[in-house]
Amino acid sequence: MTTERRLNATDTVELTVPADPAYLSVLRTVIASLAARRDFTLDEIDDLRIAVDEAGALLLPHAGPGSRVSAVFGGSADSLHAEVAVTVVPGKTGHLDRSSFAWLVLTALTDSVALDESGQRLSLVLTKARGARGQ
């Protein structure tokens, strides 16, 4: 007999993958799984999957050689957040273009997007609530 444990509000998932586009699929899979366990709709799950992929695509060009992408996923019973981060090339600022199409996609698919450019670390924090924006 098996018992499925529901994800609770204090559960977080942290992972690190090489800063390579081939590994963004791992981040997409994790966010989709967490959203499904929180009973997000299929459309909301797809929105999160695409948003995490876009966040990774925005960050990868700023990653230093041999860098890794770190991701922390968590939230509450009715929302999810994902923080995706890279270490930028030393001496290079990690400025992201907030007028780009990728940024537009991020803001359209999530409820909030926060950019943190602290030192040599560049991160995006995405948040999406279940049932938000008329879903």
Sequence positions of predicted segments:
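Small/flexible residues
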Residues: 30, 39-40, 51, 70, ...
